Design a protein with these regions (language model features):
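Positively charged n-region of N-terminal signal peptides that target proteins for export
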Residues: 1-4
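Bacterial N-terminal signal peptides
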Residues: 7-17
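N-terminal hydrophobic targeting/anchoring segments and the immediately downstream early-domain regions
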Residues: 20-182, 231, 235-399
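Distinct, well-ordered alpha-helical segments
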Residues: 146-150, 211-221
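Short, contiguous, pocket-lining structural segments
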Residues: 180-187, 203-208, 240
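Substrate-binding cleft of carbohydrate-active enzyme catalytic domains
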Residues: 193-204, 210-211, 244-250, 324
């Protein structure tokens, strides 16, 4: 595997043309149709551990291509999630492995989807009556403190990177770990600027509040929160405060609402914490049997969670978060980032990606215009992505 990864890295410079976006053929001056975008799904991690046919309707998980079509979703960012256990060794190799898996997940189903790396690529896929698959790296430890690796991952298709996951890394503090840098370290600021130069979106989901505000000061391009909800409605530390939402709006960025009930409801979060405490001995026993936290461990945890369900929350709570965040940040700065296949439970009525149309329908019921709904469902993200592309060209030209 290491030899294969090394070979892939050496060939990265040749990879980009294979995945270059072809501009859609549209009438002169005609506005392109609105697209729907979900900025975070962890389906690749599921696929890596338990491969399945994405081209047929499945009963497991939250995502496959028929359900993507049924949900009216035009573009999905698959997360190249790098578990924190790789932070000290093997993070880059694992990241390359899961990115390669994402390419395979797209390339094996050409009638359904195409791989994309740009706004033009997304719109081109829609024009071809296909859907777009993109890559976002989850966990900045993936780059192993190397700007060269960051550039290599960009060439292999990554178009955003979540600066931290649940762990504080060597250059950025996480919202759910010990602070070591008082936000971003000097190298962390270099990472943000290099992401700006490349055209890779800076994702502030999971980061500590101070890290977020440091990014606001440093970034030359608008940033995203790929899967974060409102802390005013649910007090999870990885959710965004109203002040953070206002700062993000000033930056020109966009925050995507997460669908995980624990991040939507304090009642569910409290029950989840109690359940975790109750199941701690059993989970420890599973980890002792499978220290690598592989498929045996994951399946055992799934069974424990299923046997100890959390309180139910309605899918309309997702829209409550959208509504509040729009009121704080403005209509141009909110989107959706489901976290499907990365969350152990979902709201009732939002069991998988096929249920997505309920959200725009509810937004319209609450008085949102068609134009505003299109912004929330994808066009806000597309605007930010396009601006990041513009800033990158400007920075590259300036040197």
């Amino acid at each position: 595997m290491q030899k294969r990864i090394a070979s892939v890295v050496l060939l990265l410079a040749l990879v980009t043309p294979l995945y270059a976006a072809r501009p859609a053929k549209t009438a002169a001056k005609a506005a392109p149709p609105a697209v729907t975008v979900d900025t975070h799904a962890d389906t690749p991690s599921e696929f890596l551990d338990h491969p399945f046919d994405l081209g047929i309707l499945n009963t497991r998980g939250h995502f496959d291509y028929p359900r993507m079509k049924a949900g009216g979703l035009d573009a999905e960012f698959f997360a190249a999630y790098v578990p924190a256990k790789y932070a000290n060794k093997g993070a880059a190799a694992y990241c390359m492995k899961i990115m390669e898996t994402i390419h395979e997940m797209a390339d094996a189903y050409p009638t359904w989807v195409r791989f994309a790396t740009s706004t033009a690529g997304i719109r081109s896929a829609v024009a071809e009556n296909r859907r777009a698959i993109l890559i976002g790296i989850e966990g900045g430890h993936a780059i192993e403190d190397s700007l060269d690796l960051l550039r290599a991952f960009y060439r292999f298709g990554a178009r955003y990177m979540t600066l931290t996951h649940t762990n504080t890394n060597n250059w950025a503090d996480s919202s759910t770990d010990e602070a070591k840098h008082n936000g971003l370290s000097p190298f962390g600021k270099q990472v943000v600027l290099e992401m700006n130069r490349l055209g890779m979106l800076v994702d502030i989901s999971h980061v500590a509040d101070k890290t977020f505000y440091d990014v606001m000061e440093v970034s030359k391009a608008p940033v995203i929160a790929s899967h974060s909800s409102s802390r005013a409605l649910a007090s999870a530390p990885r959710n965004m405060t109203d002040d953070m939402l206002r700062a993000l709006a000033k930056n020109g960025g966009v925050a995507m609402v997460n669908f995980y009930p624990v991040f939507l409801s304090d009642e569910v979060a409290k029950a989840s914490k109690a359940r975790d405490e109750k199941l701690k001995p059993e989970i420890a026993a599973l980890k002792a049997k499978d220290p690598s936290e592989g498929s045996e461990y994951q399946e055992g945890v799934r069974k424990l969670m299923a046997a100890n369900p959390l309180p139910k929350v309605s899918w309309t709570v997702i829209v409550d978060h959208i509504d509040h965040m729009v009121k704080v940040a403005g209509i141009d700065h909110i989107g959706i980032g489901s976290d499907f296949d990365g969350i152990p439970s979902v709201p009732e009525g939002m069991e998988d990606i096929s249920k997505l149309p309920a959200i725009p329908a509810e937004l319209k019921r609450r008085g949102y215009s068609d134009a505003d709904v299109k912004k929330i469902m994808g066009e806000n993200f597309m605007r930010v992505f396009a601006e990041a592309e513009r800033v990158a060209k400007e920075m590259q030209t300036a040197k």
